[in-house]
């Protein structure tokens, strides 16, 4: 291979990395041109890299790739069930687009991606975007407020208006912190880089502590507790028992003094009535489900006939300008606020089985030092899935991308170790120069 060919191949290998970083940077914002551009970029550069660098030459099947088969199978439920769905609404096209990561990442995961991508690239990108979001919100909110509580309220309102819902942004913050911890503890970087990475984590922690989203805050506390507990037990750092105990006390104080969490015992969560209607809908067709479009139609029909559902959910939709246009109320935006229930409504027990497989298999991949952090990412996603539906404020790309990045990083490490071992066992013979 000539020097120019090598440069071209290296450039081709780096182009998908640019697309992945653009995609990672665009995730906390509303789905639009930024994410689409990143996906189009990957659609062009991924096959270019795959062909020029002969990625197939090192391909081999591993048990870890079964997760990508599950991703593809889960995506295929959408078009297959539509064949038997008597109606088709714009929700079908929306669902296809939102579930596309299961198909795209599934295919890329099986085939393999560029070895140029590193977890710390994603970590720094996510932490940088998170820091920029928090700084922009602080500037927009200003400092002239009567008290801190009012400032926090304005901060969260600005985030909802200019960035995205608390469910989307808080999950992004939590995942960025998980990747940041990995870089600080395990990446072979200088002390300065680790300190800077740790400092970049502070804005995300601050935003999670003042968020109005209970799920985001509880996810942050739970993931931190699991990490500390795992580090203490697996690494046998028994001195950390005092750290874990102190964190439990601190977390308890945060929970007890959070206004939104205090409301749990005083008010009824609207999701209780939403889930009740969802379960009633499921019980009509528990085995096969309705399909994407019919499931939503039946859910909305039953909900509008339910007094408590109307009082705690539908009335909010009726009065919110975002959901009223062209002289009618867009009730079709109402959803079960639970990924498992919505999947069950749509695809029956087949969908539930595949969704559970997609959430369990990543924890069985045996990725060495990467496994704990992938498990924490899955835990954060599952926490969100308990209170949100896939494709609404719970983007499948979060799950698919984390699985792909950690598994690819692990495979790259294994391959490099294999090359080093072969080099040590079979040293290159001295080459006699020729005239």
Feature roles, as predicted:
Residues 1-90, 117-120, 124, 187-195, ...:
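Transmembrane signal-anchor hairpin modules in multi-pass inner-membrane enzymes, especially those
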Residues 21-28, 197-212, 380-386:
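Membrane-interface alpha helices of multi-pass inner-membrane proteins
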Residues 41-46, 355, 374-386, 390-430, ...:
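Transmembrane alpha-helices of multi-pass inner-membrane enzymes
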Residues 66-73, 88-112, 123-130, 134, ...:
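Aromatic-anchored transmembrane helix interface
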Residues 120-152, 163-232, 252-256, 402, ...:
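Alpha-helical transmembrane segments of multi-pass inner-membrane proteins
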Residues 206, 211, 231-269, 275-284, ...:
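A membrane-periplasm/extracellular boundary helix in multi-pass inner-membrane enzymes
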Residues 238, 346-379:
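Hydrophobic transmembrane alpha-helices and their immediate junctions
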Residues 294-339, 343-345:
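Interfacial juxtamembrane loops and adjacent helix segments
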């Amino acid at each position: 291979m000539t020097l120019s060919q090598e440069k071209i191949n290296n450039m081709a290998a780096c182009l998908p990395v640019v697309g992945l970083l653009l995609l990672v940077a665009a995730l906390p914002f509303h789905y639009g041109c930024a994410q689409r551009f990143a996906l189009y970029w990957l659609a062009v550069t991924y096959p270019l890299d795959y062909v020029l660098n002969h990625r197939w030459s090192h391909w081999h099947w591993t048990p870890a790739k079964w997760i990508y088969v599950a991703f593809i199978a889960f995506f295929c439920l959408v078009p297959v069930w539509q064949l038997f769905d008597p109606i088709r609404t714009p929700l079908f096209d929306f669902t296809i687009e939102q579930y596309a990561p299961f198909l795209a990442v599934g295919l890329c995961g099986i085939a393999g991606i560029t070895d140029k991508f590193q977890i710390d690239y994603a970590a720094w990108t996510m932490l940088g975007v998170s820091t920029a979001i928090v700084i922009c919100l602080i500037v927009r909110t200003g400092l002239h407020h009567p008290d801190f509580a009012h400032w926090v309220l304005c901060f969260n309102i600005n985030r909802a208006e200019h960035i995205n819902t608390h469910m989307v942004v808080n999950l992004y913050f939590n995942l960025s912190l998980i990747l940041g911890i990995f870089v600080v503890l395990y990446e072979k970087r200088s002390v300065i880089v680790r300190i800077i990475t740790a400092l970049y984590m502070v804005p995300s922690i601050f935003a999670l502590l003042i968020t109005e989203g209970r799920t985001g805050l509880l996810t942050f506390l739970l993931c931190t507790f699991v990490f500390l507990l795992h580090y203490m037990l697996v690494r046998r750092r028994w001195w950390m028992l005092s750290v874990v105990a102190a964190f439990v006390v601190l977390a308890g104080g945060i929970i007890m003094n959070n206004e939104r969490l205090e409301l749990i015992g005083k008010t009824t969560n609207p999701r209780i009535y939403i889930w009740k209607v969802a379960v009633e809908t499921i019980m009509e067709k528990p085995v096969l489900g309705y399909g994407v479009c019919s499931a939503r139609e039946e859910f909305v029909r039953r909900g509008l006939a339910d007094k408590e559902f109307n009082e705690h959910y539908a009335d909010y939709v009726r009065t919110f300008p975002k959901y009223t246009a062209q002289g009618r109320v867009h009730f079709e935006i109402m959803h079960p606020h639970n990924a498992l229930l919505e999947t069950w409504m749509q695809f029956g027990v087949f969908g539930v089985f595949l969704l559970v497989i997609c959430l369990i298999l990543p924890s069985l991949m045996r990725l060495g030092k990467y496994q704990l952090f992938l498990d924490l990412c899955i835990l954060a996603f599952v926490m969100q899935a308990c209170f949100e539906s896939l494709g609404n404020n719970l983007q499948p790309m979060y799950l698919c991308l984390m699985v792909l990045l950690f598994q690819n990083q692990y495979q790259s490490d294994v391959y490099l170790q294999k090359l080093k071992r072969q080099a040590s066992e079979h040293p290159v013979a001295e080459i006699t120069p020729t005239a």
